[in-house]
Amino acid sequence: EMKITDDENNELPWDGVAFGSLKVRGPWVLSDYFKAEPGTTLEEDGWFETGDVATIDKMGFMAITDRTKDVIKSGGEWISSIDLENTATDHPKVAESAVIGVYHPQWTERPLLLVQLKEGEEVTKEEILEWYDGKVAKWWIPDDVVFVESLPHTATGKIQKFELRQEYKDY
Protein backbone atom coordinates (compact mmCIF):
# COMPACT_ATOMS: atom_id res chain seq x y z
CA GLU A 1 0.00 0.00 0.00
CA MET A 2 1.08 3.60 -0.54
CA LYS A 3 -0.32 7.04 0.12
CA ILE A 4 0.75 10.67 0.15
CA THR A 5 0.00 13.05 3.01
CA ASP A 6 0.25 16.76 3.74
CA ASP A 7 1.99 18.41 6.72
CA GLU A 8 -0.99 17.61 8.99
CA ASN A 9 -0.92 13.92 7.94
CA ASN A 10 -4.12 14.26 5.86
CA GLU A 11 -4.20 11.84 2.94
CA LEU A 12 -4.02 13.60 -0.44
CA PRO A 13 -5.88 12.60 -3.62
CA TRP A 14 -4.44 10.33 -6.29
CA ASP A 15 -4.80 12.90 -9.06
CA GLY A 16 -1.23 13.20 -10.36
CA VAL A 17 -1.17 16.84 -9.24
CA ALA A 18 -1.18 16.87 -5.43
CA PHE A 19 2.14 15.96 -3.90
CA GLY A 20 3.07 15.16 -0.36
CA SER A 21 5.05 12.84 1.91
CA LEU A 22 5.18 9.32 0.51
CA LYS A 23 4.23 6.60 2.98
CA VAL A 24 4.18 2.84 2.40
CA ARG A 25 2.80 -0.11 4.34
CA GLY A 26 2.83 -3.85 3.82
CA PRO A 27 4.41 -7.18 4.73
CA TRP A 28 7.67 -6.37 2.92
CA VAL A 29 8.14 -2.95 4.51
CA LEU A 30 10.76 -2.78 7.24
CA SER A 31 9.56 -2.75 10.82
CA ASP A 32 12.55 -0.95 12.38
CA TYR A 33 15.89 0.52 11.40
CA PHE A 34 19.02 -1.34 12.47
CA LYS A 35 19.94 -0.37 16.04
CA ALA A 36 16.86 1.88 16.35
CA GLU A 37 14.70 1.66 19.42
CA PRO A 38 12.03 -0.96 18.61
CA GLY A 39 8.68 0.50 17.63
CA THR A 40 10.00 3.93 16.61
CA THR A 41 10.31 3.50 12.83
CA LEU A 42 6.69 2.97 11.79
CA GLU A 43 3.72 5.19 12.50
CA GLU A 44 1.14 3.80 14.91
CA ASP A 45 -0.99 2.39 12.09
CA GLY A 46 1.99 0.73 10.37
CA TRP A 47 2.83 3.36 7.74
CA PHE A 48 6.51 3.99 6.97
CA GLU A 49 7.50 7.53 5.97
CA THR A 50 10.03 7.15 3.13
CA GLY A 51 11.49 10.66 3.27
CA ASP A 52 10.33 11.27 -0.30
CA VAL A 53 7.82 13.71 -1.75
CA ALA A 54 5.68 12.17 -4.48
CA THR A 55 2.54 12.33 -6.58
CA ILE A 56 0.25 9.40 -7.33
CA ASP A 57 -2.02 9.48 -10.37
CA LYS A 58 -5.52 7.98 -10.80
CA MET A 59 -4.01 4.77 -12.19
CA GLY A 60 -1.83 4.36 -9.10
CA PHE A 61 1.45 5.32 -10.75
CA MET A 62 3.70 7.07 -8.27
CA ALA A 63 6.40 9.62 -9.18
CA ILE A 64 8.95 10.85 -6.66
CA THR A 65 9.40 14.60 -7.05
CA ASP A 66 11.85 15.44 -4.25
CA ARG A 67 13.26 14.49 -0.88
CA THR A 68 11.26 15.73 2.11
CA LYS A 69 14.30 17.56 3.50
CA ASP A 70 14.84 19.42 0.19
CA VAL A 71 11.30 20.51 -0.68
CA ILE A 72 10.65 24.23 -0.17
CA LYS A 73 7.58 25.05 1.92
CA SER A 74 6.31 28.44 0.82
CA GLY A 75 3.05 29.85 2.13
CA GLY A 76 1.74 26.39 2.98
CA GLU A 77 2.52 25.03 -0.50
CA TRP A 78 5.38 22.74 -1.48
CA ILE A 79 7.85 23.64 -4.24
CA SER A 80 10.03 20.90 -5.74
CA SER A 81 13.70 21.84 -5.64
CA ILE A 82 14.42 19.10 -8.19
CA ASP A 83 12.00 20.56 -10.77
CA LEU A 84 13.55 24.01 -10.33
CA GLU A 85 17.09 22.59 -10.62
CA ASN A 86 16.24 20.58 -13.73
CA THR A 87 14.70 23.64 -15.38
CA ALA A 88 17.75 25.79 -14.56
CA THR A 89 20.17 23.14 -15.78
CA ASP A 90 18.26 22.93 -19.09
CA HIS A 91 19.45 26.49 -19.79
CA PRO A 92 22.21 26.24 -22.42
CA LYS A 93 24.67 28.31 -20.36
CA VAL A 94 24.16 26.53 -17.02
CA ALA A 95 26.49 23.69 -16.03
CA GLU A 96 24.90 22.85 -12.69
CA SER A 97 22.40 24.27 -10.23
CA ALA A 98 21.02 23.80 -6.74
CA VAL A 99 17.89 25.19 -5.16
CA ILE A 100 17.45 25.63 -1.42
CA GLY A 101 14.77 27.20 0.70
CA VAL A 102 15.75 30.38 2.51
CA TYR A 103 13.79 32.19 5.21
CA HIS A 104 11.07 34.58 4.12
CA PRO A 105 9.06 36.63 6.67
CA GLN A 106 5.74 36.27 4.83
CA TRP A 107 6.01 32.88 3.09
CA THR A 108 8.21 30.96 5.61
CA GLU A 109 10.58 29.88 2.81
CA ARG A 110 11.30 30.94 -0.75
CA PRO A 111 13.55 29.28 -3.33
CA LEU A 112 17.10 30.52 -3.80
CA LEU A 113 18.80 29.33 -6.99
CA LEU A 114 22.56 28.75 -7.01
CA VAL A 115 24.02 28.51 -10.51
CA GLN A 116 27.37 27.35 -11.81
CA LEU A 117 27.77 28.49 -15.41
CA LYS A 118 29.50 26.54 -18.14
CA GLU A 119 33.09 27.63 -18.66
CA GLY A 120 33.34 30.92 -20.57
CA GLU A 121 29.59 31.61 -20.46
CA GLU A 122 27.90 34.76 -19.18
CA VAL A 123 24.25 35.32 -18.39
CA THR A 124 22.32 37.74 -16.18
CA LYS A 125 20.15 36.91 -13.21
CA GLU A 126 17.16 38.28 -15.13
CA GLU A 127 17.82 35.97 -18.10
CA ILE A 128 17.94 32.95 -15.79
CA LEU A 129 14.67 33.92 -14.07
CA GLU A 130 12.98 34.59 -17.45
CA TRP A 131 13.99 31.04 -18.46
CA TYR A 132 11.41 29.76 -15.96
CA ASP A 133 8.48 31.60 -17.62
CA GLY A 134 5.92 29.04 -18.78
CA LYS A 135 7.99 26.12 -17.46
CA VAL A 136 6.92 26.23 -13.80
CA ALA A 137 4.17 27.94 -11.83
CA LYS A 138 4.90 31.65 -11.47
CA TRP A 139 4.99 31.42 -7.66
CA TRP A 140 7.64 28.66 -7.92
CA ILE A 141 10.14 30.96 -9.65
CA PRO A 142 13.13 31.57 -7.35
CA ASP A 143 13.29 34.95 -5.64
CA ASP A 144 16.98 35.32 -6.40
CA VAL A 145 19.91 33.79 -8.26
CA VAL A 146 23.43 33.48 -6.89
CA PHE A 147 26.22 32.67 -9.32
CA VAL A 148 28.89 30.39 -7.83
CA GLU A 149 32.24 29.09 -9.07
CA SER A 150 31.33 25.57 -7.97
CA LEU A 151 28.83 23.65 -5.87
CA PRO A 152 29.88 21.33 -3.02
CA HIS A 153 29.50 17.59 -3.67
CA THR A 154 29.58 14.42 -1.62
CA ALA A 155 31.97 11.58 -2.44
CA THR A 156 29.19 10.03 -4.53
CA GLY A 157 28.64 13.22 -6.56
CA LYS A 158 25.45 14.50 -4.92
CA ILE A 159 25.19 18.21 -4.20
CA GLN A 160 25.62 18.89 -0.49
CA LYS A 161 22.46 20.86 0.15
CA PHE A 162 23.01 20.75 3.90
CA GLU A 163 26.23 22.71 3.41
CA LEU A 164 24.47 25.20 1.12
CA ARG A 165 21.63 25.67 3.62
CA GLN A 166 24.21 26.42 6.31
CA GLU A 167 26.11 28.86 4.09
CA TYR A 168 22.98 30.76 3.02
CA LYS A 169 20.93 30.47 6.24
CA ASP A 170 20.99 34.25 6.76
CA TYR A 171 20.44 35.15 3.11
Q: Residue ranges of each PLM-predicted region?
A:
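Hydrophobic alpha-helical segments, especially N-terminal targeting/anchoring helices
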Residues: T5-D6, G16, T50, I56, ...
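AMP-binding/adenylate-forming catalytic core of the ANL superfamily
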Residues: G20, G26, S31-D32, D45, ...
